[in-house]
Amino acid sequence: MAYPFQLGLQDATSPIMEELMNFHDHTLMIVFLISSLVLYIISLMLTTKLTHTSTMDAQEVETIWTILPAVILILIALPSLRILYMMDEINNPVLTVKTMGHQWYWSYEYTDYEDLCFDSYMIPTNDLKPGELRLLEVDNRVVLPMELPIRMLISSEDVLHSWAVPSLGLKTDAIPGRLNQATVTSNRPGLFYGQCSEICGSNHSFMPIVLEMVPLKNFENWSTSMI
């Protein structure tokens, strides 16, 4: 989860988020090198006497500044495309959970179980217990097994929503009449928080998401108690 005055990304909890953080560092380094080169050229222009003012063309320079940007774009595009394909790939999910966005709460249905479904509302600030997080706690958490691929089917009952959990690298639009899917895989147990990331009305800020990732045995005990 995020902390006050945090400057970086949240700790990665899934393979996809780890890839996204590596891609972020990769792209940031390229941007840093380009910015340094531009600043260096500007400083030379400001401190050096202008020469070759009558030169009309320079084939070598034009070739370099055509090929070099193309190479840089390829270095950015290839890792990006790889991650996009990884995010769309779902191999043998052990569990499918259907998520529906409403104004202004989420509902969940475990399609592999009969009658295992519930609504998840934000806990009002006045009802929070000591240590609980304002605007992030819910009355019913989404309990899922860790270290296993889980398919999330995401849609909306009314307006556009977006189901997002940053530490897992997840952000999928919930669109009325359309069923989107995403893969959830957590490397470790714990509570992972997210929020609706699409402005959906006056209470848009009050649609938190809480995933509780637990070992498989604990998940089986929880699902048995819920049915």
Swiss-Prot record:
The chain crosses the membrane at residues 15-45, 60-87. Pfam families: COX2, COX2_TM. Residues 46-59 are mitochondrial matrix. Binds a dinuclear copper A center per subunit. Its cofactor is Cu cation. Cu cation A1 binds at H161, C196, C200, M207. It is a multi-pass membrane protein. Mg(2+) binds at E198. Gene3D superfamilies: 1.10.287.90, Cupredoxins - blue copper proteins. It is found in: Mitochondrion inner membrane. It catalyses: 4 Fe(II)-[cytochrome c] + O2 + 8 H(+)(in) = 4 Fe(III)-[cytochrome c] + 2 H2O + 4 H(+)(out). GO terms for molecular function: copper ion binding; cytochrome-c oxidase activity. GO terms for cellular component: mitochondrial inner membrane; respiratory chain complex IV. InterPro entries: CcO_II, CcO_II-like_C, CcO_II_C, Copper_CuA, Cupredoxin, Cyt_c_oxidase_su2, Cyt_c_oxidase_su2_TM_dom, Cyt_c_oxidase_su2_TM_sf. Its EC number is 7.1.1.9. GO terms for biological process: ATP synthesis coupled electron transport. Cu cation A2 binds at C196, E198, C200, H204. Keywords: Copper, Electron transport, Magnesium, Membrane, Metal-binding, Mitochondrion, Mitochondrion inner membrane, Respiratory chain, Translocase, Transmembrane, Transmembrane helix, Transport. Residues 1-14, 88-227 are mitochondrial intermembrane. Component of the cytochrome c oxidase (complex IV, CIV), a multisubunit enzyme composed of 14 subunits. The complex is composed of a catalytic core of 3 subunits MT-CO1, MT-CO2 and MT-CO3, encoded in the mitochondrial DNA, and 11 supernumerary subunits COX4I, COX5A, COX5B, COX6A, COX6B, COX6C, COX7A, COX7B, COX7C, COX8 and NDUFA4, which are encoded in the nuclear genome. Component of the cytochrome c oxidase, the last enzyme in the mitochondrial electron transport chain which drives oxidative phosphorylation. The respiratory chain contains 3 multisubunit complexes succinate dehydrogenase (complex II, CII), ubiquinol-cytochrome c oxidoreductase (cytochrome b-c1 complex, complex III, CIII) and cytochrome c oxidase (complex IV, CIV), that cooperate to transfer electrons derived from NADH and succinate to molecular oxygen, creating an electrochemical gradient over the inner membrane that drives transmembrane transport and the ATP synthase. Belongs to the cytochrome c oxidase subunit 2 family. PANTHER family: CYTOCHROME C OXIDASE SUBUNIT 2 (PTHR22888:SF9), CYTOCHROME C OXIDASE, SUBUNIT II (PTHR22888). This is Cytochrome c oxidase subunit 2. The gene is MT-CO2.
